[in-house]
Every structure is written in C-alpha cells, then in structure tokens.
C-alpha cells in the first residue's frame, strides 16, 4: 500500500513539474507538449486513486452515490480525504484544459472538482481547493464576457472564506499538499500564507469584475484590500504591485481624495524601487532578455510618473475651481476664507482617514511617508504652494519623457507635452504679475508649436486639432493679458500695440487652421457640424470675431475690414443657430453676445465710413 501511494504522489508531482516548469521550455511548434503529458499523468493519478471506476466517471459517480467517495477507492482512506484528493486532480485537470485553451473541458473538470468537495468545503482538506475551483470558474466566465456569472462564482468563494475563518479558522491544507510525503508537509505558517494568497486572488478577480460592472467604488475598495494583503503576506511582483497602486491612485483623484491618491503613488514609488537592480545598458546589449526587462522597467517607471503628473494637474485644477471668480480670476476673499478654514479641518481629517488606507507594515512606512512629504495633498491656495505642486509635476513630466519619446511613442509623447502645458496654464492662474503670467503662456507656445508644425494631419488629425486649438487659446489669453497691461499705461506704446496685434493674428491663424481641418476634401466648410466639434468650432468663430475687434490700427480702411470680418464671424454663429436649433444649448453665452454684436457693428461701421468720407 505504501508503495502504491508513493507511486500516486510521484506521478502527481511529475505532472505538476511538467505543467508549471517544463512547459516554459516547450518548442514553438508544440507549445502544449508538456501540458498534454501532464494531463495524461493526472488521469493516471485519478485511476490510481479509484482503480475500480471508469476513468471518465469515477469522481462524479462517487459524489453522486449516497455514501460519496468513502464508499469506494483506496481502502483505509476516509471519504473526506479521498474526496479532497479527487477534487485536487479534477481541479488540476480543469486548469490544464483552460491553459491549453479547451475552455468547455476545463469548465467541466472545475465544476466536477467543486461538486466532489461540496459536502466537505468547510473542512481543512477541502476549503482551499474548493475556493480555487470557484476562482478559476470566475475567471473562465469573465473571459467569456459573462461577468454576472463570474461574479456569482467569485462572491461564493469570498463568502466561503469568511465562513471558514469564522467557524473553523485553522490553516487550510494546500491542494498540492495532499500528494506530499510526511516530511514534505507544510508548516502551519506556510499553509496560512498559501491559503491567504488564494483568498487575495479572489479579491483581485472581484475587483476586476466590479470594474466591468461599473461599480467603481467597490472595485477600488477590493483593489485596495488586494494590495494591502499582497504586502501583508509578501506575495507580489514589485512592478505589477506598483502599477496597480498607481492605477488605483487615479480613481482616488477622480473622487478628489488626494491624500489617498498620494499615498498610493508614494507606495508605488517605494515598492517599484524594490524591483531587481536595473541592469546596465552594457549588460543589456549582450543579453536580449535583459534588454526586454530593462525596457519594461523603464516603461513602467514612466507610467507611474504619468500618474503623478495627473495627480498634480488635478490638484491644481480643483484648487483653481475653488478659488476663481465669475470671470476666471483668483478671488482674494475666497482665498483668505479657505486658508483660515483649511488649518482647522485638515489635521483631524488626515489622522482619521490615514488609519483606513495605510499600506504595508513598519518596514516601508517611513519610506512611503518620506515620498508623501515631497508633495502636498491639500489644495494649494497661493502661488508659492501652487509652484511646489507644479515643480513636482514637472519633475515627473521629465521622467516620463525619458521613455515616451516622440520617435516611437508619438501619441504618448504629445499627451505628456500637453500635460506640461496644462501645468504652466494652471500655475499662471496663481500668478498676480501679468508679465510673468505671459512668460508662462509663452513657454506653452514654445513647447506646443514645434509639435504642431512637425505632425502630419493626414495621420494625426485629432491631435493636430487639439494642438491648433490650444495654441490659439494660449495666444488669445496672452493677448488679453497684454491688453490689460497696456490699459494700465497712460498711453499704449508702439511695442505693446505690435505685441497685441501679433498675438491676435497668431490666435486667429491657429483658430482658422482648426476650422480649416473641418473642411471636406474639396475645401467646403460643413453645413452641419458634428456634435464632437460643434462647440469648439463655434468658440473658434466667436473668438476670431472678438480678435478682429481687438486689432489696433490707425488706418481707417483696415479698421473697417477688421470690423467686417468680425461681423461675418458673429453672423455665422447667429445664422447657424437659427437653422440648427439644437446647437443653441451648447453655445448660449456666445450666441447672446453674437446677437448683440450683429446688431451693433453695422452702426459702428456706418459711423466709420462717414468719418472716412469726411477726410477724403
């Protein structure tokens, strides 16, 4: 009997080695060679466990008989133990079939594994294999797009874990341990670690399911718990963990939970640094695998950096929304009010919330806290505070650009440059000095303009439109600032007038480039604008109209031409909305002003014509 059992164990372990280790070296033309051999060995194990049964029906037949597995199989074994061993073999066969893309057969074995263990699912021998079968059925149904079915399996696994821990609480036996010799048996500590890892997988898959079901808050909670447990049980890949934590931070950003977001990002930095030593470029040149690994690490580091950039951008953006008045300028009264209120609230809030979200144990706590202290999580309320957030964001911009370069990563690189531009735009809001604010906007033009000139609209039409519109907006904003500076002078000097005109003409140029991109191949402007470009196109028309009105000229004829161009653009908006009533709701403010200008400008033009006639 002992020799028979030794043969069973050796056959099972050989199957696992083939499946988990040797399969990695299978040739490309036989990618599943080791998996198929492992399957044959697992079937042998099943026959050895139940020699008197038909191979295809022994496990199911035993469970369906009144007495269950104890009524047959190897003499002297308890029904519970035999059931557990059979369930493990069925579970492994289920995995084997899913790994070789035979999903229906895989499902059949996984369901059979669960059915065998149904009565014993709360036992030390059975709980782990039962939960793992449920987990894998959840994955299988999720891959089929049947998310609700996946949810039922995974929530069943979660519920069983809670019930087992409440009613039994002992370290569960790992499935493979059923085929270990006495000397190979796991310690209670190792059993606990493996069982908790199984449950962590349940939570991880549930997080994905809730995300698919648009239950974002629940998905975030499960993701957070998964990350905490992976640290607690030292069961994680540092790079994957860091990416998942950085991704979770973006959810917290959308909820304006900046302390939680910062904590996730700081922890991501600390755990990412635990990834193995990045190989030198020289070593990578000699080893293709090392080169791939180096590239992956650089990419993931850049992705985490981009999450930090989004954190800084959103923190500044939300601060701006709190502080701006009805014309988009910083409201000093609100600023003082928020400063007074912040100190009272922040300390208590941080203390309470931190208890709920802390990652990891004392060994990484200090490092995470040090990373957190490099950037605030409360809204900046003045230029000094905003600049500190800006500098952190800019540092991560530079870090992300190291990997996402224009050559090879066009879209990503341009998004990063656009984020850099947005950082300058948000910082400019906090700057009181108009000249310094202009310089910040000039930095934006300097970084965006070369990209706009370099990209071919034939291949990057949407990106080109974004750049054209942002360049136009930035020039428009600079012109407004220069007008405000000029208005403070007793008399506007020639240099200021030239600058205002130059900026206005640049803004007009880019708005018109944007509008031209909407034309058909035969250069006709669309009679009806698509919904996604309707508001941008109307805003462009409105601002072109206003810009022509801002151009300064001493030549009456040029003044008349500019007013006419201004009128034409205002009139376009009014006429378009007259024909397309549904457009009114997205352009209400601009439409009202356009109607006023359409009524006023002809009178102004007539007065100017009379003046010109009197001088001729």
Curated annotation (Swiss-Prot):
Keywords: Cytoplasm, Cytoskeleton, Developmental protein, Differentiation, Neurogenesis. InterPro entries: KBP, TPR-like_helical_dom_sf. Residues 59-78 have a biased composition (Basic and acidic residues). One of its GO terms (biological process) is cell differentiation. Activator of KIF1B plus-end-directed microtubule motor activity. Required for organization of axonal microtubules, and axonal outgrowth and maintenance during peripheral and central nervous system development. It is found in: Cytoplasm, Cytoskeleton. It comes from Xenopus tropicalis. It comes from the Eukaryota. GO terms for cellular component: cytoskeleton; mitochondrion. This is KIF-binding protein. SUPFAM superfamilies: TPR-like. Residues 52-78 are annotated as: Disordered. Belongs to the KIF-binding protein family.
